[in-house]
């Protein structure tokens, strides 16, 4: 999972992610922005569910983050649909609306994001 942090001309940090992980970048850009307390909440949740059967989720304005002890899923809220809406044999996937990655990989991106934010 490759990523890049940039600042636009106004100083706002933007995250770009590799293919198949675009929704993670969108989550940072739309939900986190400068809200490092949200990252604290996610990191705490990751510690809480680690090694258990539990999961945790945080719905935002545009994206929802879901995690368990092994995996993080970020999906666009517009992807609300039930399994019955998908034809048999078909799967719905929009790479900019849904991303999955391991918890450890995700936490590495969070740490790198924090570090980049401190380089103002």
Swiss-Prot record:
InterPro entries referenced in this protein's UniProt entry, alphabetically: UPF0231
One Pfam family in the UniProt entry: UPF0231
Cysteine pairings via disulfide bonds: none
Protein family: Belongs to the UPF0231 family.
Protein name (database record): UPF0231 protein KPK_4613
Species of provenance: Klebsiella pneumoniae (strain 342)
Lineage summary: Bacteria, Pseudomonadati, Pseudomonadota, Gammaproteobacteria, Enterobacterales
């Amino acid at each position: 999972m490759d990523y890049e942090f940039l600042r636009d001309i106004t100083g706002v940090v933007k995250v770009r992610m590799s293919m198949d992980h675009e929704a993670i970048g969108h989550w940072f850009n739309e939900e986190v922005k400068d809200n490092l307390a949200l990252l604290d909440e996610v990191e705490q949740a990751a510690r809480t569910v680690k090694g258990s059967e539990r999961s945790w989720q945080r719905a935002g304005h545009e994206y929802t983050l879901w995690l368990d002890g092994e995996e993080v899923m970020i999906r666009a809220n517009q992807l609300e649909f039930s399994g019955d809406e998908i034809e048999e044999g078909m799967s719905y996937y929009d790479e900019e609306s849904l991303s999955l990655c391991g918890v450890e990989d995700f936490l590495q991106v969070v740490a790198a994001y924090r570090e980049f934010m401190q380089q103002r």
